[in-house]
A protein has these predicted regions:
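Bacterial Sec-dependent N-terminal signal peptides
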Residues: 1-26, 31
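Extracellular glycan-targeting catalytic surfaces
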Residues: 25-143, 151, 155, 178, ...
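Acidic/His metal-coordination segments adjacent to aromatic residues that form catalytic metal sites
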Residues: 86-93, 134-140, 183-203
Length: 801
């Protein structure tokens, strides 16, 4: 049978029929260890890197790498012994890091391909029961990881496809490499400048991802497909960029937002691991330079240095790859540091937990003070209870280990949310859990599922120094006010006039409200806590313009009648009735970035006329944030407007709203009319339009639904129905958990409709829902799978893949 070229693969992928399933025995062997006396550690029934089966990690890695190397070295009987043992016994890969177990699974597949003449049905059966489900689950959950994960997963997919001669699986691997909505796809991992998605993280992971992409290209080349050439030799640019930086040269760098939205704060190349060269550069060099005659000057220089290192015996034979250090290149100094701030005397502390932090490379643990906050936690049976939780805050760079010791009770399990962030809870004993952070997060540590006394962890990059902030204020012609660490009553909070920068030293606690009123050009920065005892308004912004609030922990912070307001690294926790977290009333150009809300009413709202503020609400954006609604909605749009205000003849508009990269940890609202994590309810003659929900992850709905989009007349709060809702997009919204309550889209009448609602990439428990999804009975509506009720006076609802 005639096989298709890559050009036809790309144009007519569905028609691939046969492949030249071969493996070059000339592939360089990474390790030169003598395997003739190797003793197998396994086989293991379950392989994992974390959790219950984590003890299988090292042994399974050694075994599967040994099988590949021995097959290449001609030690066929010993390779077959390992292959057959795992083919008979291995059932699955387990744990959060199961996709990374496909590193060794790839080695095993390559060994099996070399030894295919001795294959048995058990080989393919093992691949299909253990490897392919792990690949499928990763794709169902994607995108959520840095790109080396996706590249590693896809490398194993291609190796498995070649091993078992599955042309459809091979086609999927090529499609993923070129087009996947994951950081592990070539165009999402390597930019047109050569910068990699993980360049800003560190060089070990960037080279790991590049190496996996090179392996994919090598396997495809063995089948006659030239993935090296994809996107105008894009991978060559990534290899050259990496070689250039790791040899000590400067490189261009641009902060970008990756497809997960999680890894977008790196503003320079990651210096960790710089100059520690992984043996990944020879394969691409031989292809691009040796075969195609292209130029790779930095890679050429790197390989020349590598040969010298080999002659001097300076190359370390690692399990995953050989490595060596480039002479004269050192890691940067901006590495692992942690910054903790003692609580001031008089601040409300809580002693349920002892929390310790340790930067990577240090032997010392530092205790972090634990504050108390009240929440209105759900306790089941349509009930809530005011309870006390704990929270800590610290800053760090690089990596930091966190140890949490439960002082008052024993526990069996620990969960660290958002789940999507992938923070692994390593339970040390019945009172201690430990985990690693490699970038700042806002997290909830929950023991045995308890959310009534959990621990919140707020972390950030270190704030700007007092001296630098003062210099900036002076250059801007602003007044600079510095508040030193301490506990402050309401009367100690200064007035904040226009053209003021207020710097709160870490370790400041306030029991009053920072009132920004009728002002412009105001900044509150540093690290402070402002939590009045009644539970409302640690800060508010009224009738003001050009305002920045950065690094403040508070209860609530409404913004009314204002323009150009930014809240960054603000954390809101509330417990009383009507305890909305971050409300917007009749304001425009409001940005929320990296905020956290756990509130006793709506976490964030966008209203028009309300609370004495008149007018429309426009250009509201929230990104990179975490929302937890103990009551009501995480996001609520549109209810209030001019009909209930002093000028009921006016028509307000709520428009141009973007919510992106949001984790929603809870909705617990028993009243059906107030459910919907993503809720739009046009009232008071409002027109709500141009709304985008993008990359939203929802988990743990106690009582609630995914969405409500309505035009309604709620007589409790409104004087009239809304005018309508139009042009709303739900893009890459994902829910994982038990069956949610019924979502609703419903208009009011023929003059007050819902129009043009688009769903793109909607996933419910890993299943992508769209109008053409396979297996959907023709008589089913796509909405039934959510479940979603589409009522009357609704036009143009579409579900796209």
């Amino acid at each position: 049978m005639k096989r298709l070229s890559l050009t036809l693969v790309l144009l007519c992928a569905a028609h691939i029929s046969l492949f030249n399933f071969q493996l070059s025995l000339a592939t360089p062997v990474a390790a030169q260890t003598d395997y003739s006396t190797y003793q197998m550690a396994g086989p293991y029934e379950v392989v994992a890197r974390d959790g219950q089966y984590r003890s299988s990690k090292a042994g399974s890695e050694r075994d599967m790498k040994a099988a590949m190397v021995m097959a290449r070295q001609g030690l066929h009987d010993k390779a077959l012994a390992i292959i057959n043992a795992y083919a008979d016994k291995l059932q699955r890969f387990d744990g959060h890091d199961a996709p990374l177990c496909l590193i060794q699974a790839y080695w095993l597949c390559r060994a099996m391909t070399i030894e295919r003449d001795q294959s048995t049905p058990a080989w393919e059966a093992m691949i299909r029961r253990a490897m392919l489900p792990t690949i499928s689950q990763f794709e169902a959950d994607s995108p959520y990881a840095n790109g080396n994960w996706g590249a590693i997963v896809n490398r194993c997919r291609m190796a498995a496809a070649i091993c078992i001669e599955d042309s459809a699986l091979y086609r999927d691997a090529i499609d993923y490499f070129l087009h996947a909505n994951d950081n592990g796809a070539l165009p999402r991992y390597v930019s047109t400048t050569g910068q990699c998605q993980e360049t800003g993280r560190d060089q070990a992971h960037a080279q790991l991802g590049l190496g996996a992409l090179c392996d994919i290209c090598e396997m495809a080349e063995e089948q006659g497909d030239d993935l090296w050439a994809a996107l105008d030799n894009r991978l060559m640019l990534g290899i050259e960029y990496s070689a250039r930086y790791n040899l000590g040269y400067d490189v261009p760098f641009q902060t970008w937002t990756d497809c997960t939205g999680l890894y977008n704060e790196w503003n320079e190349p990651g210096a960790m691991g710089r100059g520690l060269i992984r043996d990944i550069y020879d394969k691409p060099y031989q292809h691009y330079v040796g075969k195609k005659g292209l130029k790779m000057p930095y890679t050429k220089k790197l390989l020349a240095l590598q040969k010298k290192a080999e002659r001097r015996g300076e190359v370390h034979e690692g399990l995953e790859a050989r490595d060596w250090r480039a002479p004269g290149v050192t890691e940067g100094k901006r590495l692992h540091q942690v910054f903790t701030y003692p609580a001031p005397a008089g601040a409300p502390l809580k002693h349920d937990y002892d929390v310790f932090v340790q930067p990577r490379g240090s032997k010392d643990w530092t205790r972090v003070d634990t504050y108390m906050a009240k929440v209105n936690a759900p306790i089941g049976n349509n009930k809530h209870r005011i309870s006390e939780i704990s929270y800590v805050l610290f800053d760090f760079t690089g990596d930091v280990f966190v140890r949490v010791v439960s002082k008052n009770r024993k526990f069996q399990s620990a969960r660290i949310r958002p789940d999507y962030r992938g923070t692994i809870a390593n339970v040390q004993n019945d009172s201690t859990v430990q985990f690693l952070l490699f970038q700042p997060e806002n997290l909830s540590v929950e023991l045995d599922g308890d959310i009534t006394s959990n621990l919140l962890l707020f972390t950030s990059r270190p704030p700007i120094s007092k001296e630098e902030a003062e210099a900036q204020a002076k250059a801007q012609g602003r007044q600079f006010i510095y508040i030193k660490p301490g506990h402050y009553n309401p009367d100690a909070i200064p007035d904040i006039p226009s053209n003021t920068t207020l710097y709160l030293a870490p370790g400041t606690y306030f029991t009053g409200t920072f009132a920004i009123e009728d002002a412009q050009n105001v900044s509150i920065i540093g690290r402070g806590i402002a939590r009045p005892e009644k539970g409302y308004e640690g800060c508010h912004v009224h009738r003001s313009r050009n305002v920045l609030i950065d690094g403040l922990v508070l209860n609530t912070c409404p913004v009314g009648g204002s323009d150009h307001v930014t809240l960054h690294d603000v954390r809101s926790i509330s417990h009383p009735g009507w305890g909305d977290g971050l409300n917007v009333f009749a304001s425009s150009n409001v940005l929320y970035d990296r905020v956290f809300c756990r509130n006793s009413d709506d976490c964030t709202t966008a209203y028009a006329t309300r609370k004495g503020f008149e007018g429309s609400a426009r250009n509201i954006r929230m990104r990179n944030s975490t929302l937890w609604a103990d009551v009501a909605h995480p996001i609520f749009i549109g209810l209030h407007g001019a009909a209930a205000g002093p000028h009921p003849e006016r028509r307000d508009t709520v428009e141009n709203l973007i919510y992106e990269n949001i984790d929603i940890l809870c909705q617990s609202e028993p009243q059906v009319d107030y459910q919907g994590c993503l809720a739009i309810n046009a009232g008071d003659n409002n027109l709500v339009r141009n709304i985008l929900f993008d990359n939203i992850r929802i988990e743990q709905l106690h009582q609630g639904s995914i969405l409500q989009v309505k035009v309604a007349f709620n007589s409790k709060y409104c004087a009239a129905p809304g005018l309508g809702v139009e042009d709303v997009t739900f893009r890459n919204v994902r829910y994982r958990g038990q069956q949610p309550y019924l979502s609703i889209i419903n208009g009011y009448d023929e003059q007050h409709k819902v129009r043009n609602i688009t769903f793109e990439g909607l996933k419910i428990n890993g299943q992508t829902l769209h109008d053409k999804m396979p297996g959907k009975p023709a008589w089913y509506s796509t909405a039934d799978y959510i479940p979603l009720f589409i009522g009357n006076h609704v036009e143009n609802i579409t579900f796209k893949k």
